[in-house]
Amino acid sequence: IKLLDPNLLACSEWKELMQQLIDSKAWVDFTQGLDIRLMTAEKADMIRQCKTKMLHFAWDNPEDELTFEKLKEYRKAFTLPDDKCKVYVLTNFNSTHEQDLERVYRLRDIGYDPFVMVYEKWTAPKKTRRLQRWCNNKIIFRAEPDFAKYK
């Protein structure tokens, strides 16, 4: 089952919809980022009961520390490997390069696989495009963990 807008966590009928997914015993593809800010222990438990190969979350605003705290709090609730728990990192939109890089490092440190998305890529500075190339190419990202050393 491919969910094109899977923000079930914000839906008033989230519990019934999640139960339908669980009962279906089908593989569930949450194609967009689930809103971690709305996560509770009950919601995490129901997501864990779904057959899924990957989870996506997002951390768009570097000033939003609640998002990071929730990501940190619930990482252990999802038993998927690090490379199967992705977090979209919006860049080139109300953030500095330093803030973008800090989010990438912090997410990696707590067990998520960051995925850099560049807003209006054609206007982005070269270092932002390089950050995206470094972070999203997982062979490079794992081989060279320090962006400053990436050539």
What residues fall within each predicted segment?
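Auxiliary Fe-S-binding modules of radical SAM enzymes
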Residues: 90-151
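Short, basic (Lys/Arg/His-rich) helix/loop patches that form interaction surfaces
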Residues: 77-83
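Anion (oxyanion) recognition and catalysis
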Residues: 22, 79, 105-109
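Core AdoMet radical
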Residues: 1-71, 84-93, 113-117
